[in-house]
Each structure stands twice: as C-alpha cells, then as structure tokens.
A protein has these predicted regions:
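Short alpha-helical segments used as structural interaction elements across diverse proteins
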Residues: 16-21, 37, 52, 66-69, ...
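Short, solvent-exposed alpha-helical "recognition" segments
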Residues: 62-65, 123-127
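Short, cationic-aromatic polyanion-contact patches
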Residues: 14, 38, 72-88
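Extreme N-terminal segment that seeds HTH/winged-HTH DNA-binding domains in transcriptional regulators
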Residues: 1-35, 41, 90, 94-126
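Beta-hairpin "wing" of winged helix-turn-helix
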Residues: 29-34, 61-71, 75-78
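N-terminal helix-turn-helix
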Residues: 36-67
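Short hydrophobic/aromatic-rich motifs at helix boundaries and adjacent loops
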Residues: 10-12, 28-29, 44, 68-73, ...
Length: 127
C-alpha cells in the first residue's frame, strides 16, 4: 500500500497513516475483506516505528473501518453506504469547524460563508 507520509507536517505520523488508509477505504480503493499490510511490514515500508502503525490501526479499528483476525492480520470491514456517508459528514464537520470559526472571528457573516459554500458547490459540478 502506498502512503505519502511526511515528517515536516504538524500532523503526527500515526494520524497521517490513519487518514490516508481511511481515505482509501472510503474511496473504494480498499474494499471489504481486503487484507491490510501487517503492522511490521507497513512500518518497515514507511520507515516508521511499529508503535506508530499499531496506533493508527487501533484508531481505524475503533472507528469500525478495519478489524483484526487473530493470527491473520487486519482487514477492511464491511461498511454500508449510510455508514460511509456518516463518516464523510463527520470528517467534513471536523475539517470545517476551525476555518469556519476563524472566518466568523474575522468578521464574515453567516450569509457571506453560505455564499462562499454555494460558490464552491457550484464549481464542484453535479456531485
């Protein structure tokens, strides 16, 4: 599995791993039942500690995105479309919260922000 990790980011490596694996699952690049790389294997390939990968996998497991089978490794869990949609909504909310509060603090009105969101949606096409 190819991940793009960087140590110059403020984001911890375990968060980068979990975020990128989550994105691959939600985008369908990794499907239900797919076997994930072993913790040691991914740590070796990405040149990070085993603990870093273990923590990333534990986080993804708590989210319900992956599960472990004793002695066999980690696998992508079966997710309903509604579960995927709810996860995407949660991630969007988490991503937008800080910039939204900053925009309000800088004097933008709710109407200004709604106009910007509508513009972005219009630019994104029919999705």
């Amino acid at each position: 599995m190819i991940l793009n990790l960087t140590d110059i980011s403020d984001e911890p490596l375990q968060s980068q791993i979990s975020r990128q694996v989550r994105a691959k699952i939600l985008a369908g690049e990794l499907g239900a039942g797919d076997n994930l790389p072993s913790i040691r294997g991914l740590a070796r390939d990405q040149r990070v500690s085993v603990i870093t990968v273990q923590r990333a996998y534990e986080y993804l497991e708590r989210e319900g995105l992956i599960h472990s089978r004793r002695g066999k490794g980690f696998f992508v869990s079966e997710l309903s479309d509604s579960a995927k949609k709810e996860m995407a909504k949660t991630r969007l909310l988490e991503t937008l919260q800080a910039p939204l509060l900053a925009a309000l603090a800088e004097g933008l009105s709710k109407a200004d922000i709604q106009q910007i969101v509508q513009l972005l949606l219009a630019q994104s096409g029919d999705n």
